[in-house]
Amino acid sequence: MGVDIVDVSSGGNLHNAPIKAVPGFQIPFAEAIRAKAGIPTTAVGLITEAKQADEIVSSGKADAVFLARAMIRNPRWAMAAAEELGVKIDWPLQFDRGRTLN
């Protein structure tokens, strides 16, 4: 038994915490834990753009990104991100017919 991946977040529970909530503000925490502990991490914190998420993973700052607000705003975010990045993915059959309408 062990840990497969660590979801790194500063929590955001204190209104007066000295951390500014700007796009990617939690990434340095994930990057530091990944480097020092040698364990895969996920990055969170106002990650909203496909290229931003791709850069985080491809540069080794984190092994994955977790999205909340972006997925609430657009439940098909992953499909749109794949298209933006030129990655061909299989769409769920339920969505496939709607893909060509836009």
Give, region by region, the residue ranges found by the protein language model:
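Flavin-dependent oxidoreductase catalytic cores
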Residues: 1-102
